[in-house]
Structures are given as C-alpha cells and as structure tokens.
C-alpha cells in the first residue's frame, strides 16, 4: 500500500505542472483579444508587456484556487499558531504586526487574512496583545510589480477596509528602496515582518533579492514563509529524483 500511495503521489506531482501550464495557455487567446479590443497594440508588440497582461489574467483565475489549497496552513502561520512546523489552536508565537512587507501580493487574495489578524485571532488574544503594548498592523506594503494584478489589489484593499493601512508597491523587490521607481521608499531595518507565500520560486535573482529583503527587517524582525521546499528524504526515491 505504501508503494501504491507513493506511485499515486508521483503521478499527481508529474501531472500537476502540465495542468498548471495548460490552464495558463487557456488565457492566451483572451489576452490577445482583450488587447485588440482596447486598441492596446503596444502590449501586443511588446513581449514583456504581453507577458504581464497574460499573467495578470491567468492569476486572477488561479490565485483564489491556490489560496483555497494553502489557507489551512497559511492562516495559522500568520496568526502565530505554528511552532516548529506544527499547527495548533493556541497562539504560541507572535502574529504578524507592525510594519509588514508582503511579497508577491498578487490580486490581494491574502488581504482579508491581514484584516482579520489586524484585530486579533480572538478577543482574549487581542486583549493580551494590548496589555503587552503591541499594536496590530500599522502598515502593510504589498509588493506587486504586475500592473494588472496591482490594479486589482488596490480595489481589493478598499473592499476589505484596509485602505490607509495597506499600500500597494507596484515595483519589484530590487526597487523597494528606490524613490525614483515608485512614490515611496522602504528604508533598511524599517520592517517588523516579511510575508512570502509561494512566491520566492518565481522572483528574479533570488539570492540577491532575498538578501535585500533581510536588510529591510528590523533587528528581531520576523519572516513568515510558506514556500515550495526540497522534498523530505522519507518521501521516497522517485519523488526526490523527479524534483532533482
């Protein structure tokens, strides 16, 4: 049974990336038609602009599905209910608070979770946080360089009442402290928390940009990560070989 279970998981892992790419291909014709209808020929003639528009349309569809499959792990993480990789019902670590940097914010699919955590996991936890002198979220910077996703993110922020707390930063990680790239600047050692959810696998120059993110953290700052990782050796040879 263990072998069959491993083979089943192997087949699923082999198929999933191709299903993902197949779904993305479905949005290619509609992105072309959208640009033609809008008379946006500069997008059609620019590979980089077209890629951004295509990705924005695709992610608006697939993002909520990604959230649905991950939120049972991500929400406890942000609420401080995860310790040593184990989830529980009690708050055992500090929830996100203060100034937060959300990387790859997309269309705002996690913004409602930020709004929930901002008022505490429950009344008792909220009261405890106040007694300790800790605040909720004072500022959230959502890093989203895709123009289409950033526009949707701004609308989402207003819908859930985080306008004035959540600021959309429409540039990549490499430009977060460059006031010429956007209307603001995130200073080194000014951020309390960083949140990355299934995004570090797709950022450019990961080593350089991860180092830049670390530099933005205050001393004692916290990084909340839910990412693709190297498969556990106990999962079997086939899955490890496929990932390699």
Please tell me what each predicted stretch does.
Residues 192-205:
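A short SAM/SAH-binding and catalytic strip from SAM-dependent methyltransferases
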Residues 178-194:
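A short acidic, Gly/Pro-enriched loop at the edge of an enzyme's catalytic core
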Residues 2-49:
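N-terminal auxiliary segments of SAM/dcSAM-dependent transferases
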Residues 64-98, 109-117:
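Conserved alpha-helix/loop element of class I SAM-dependent methyltransferases that forms part
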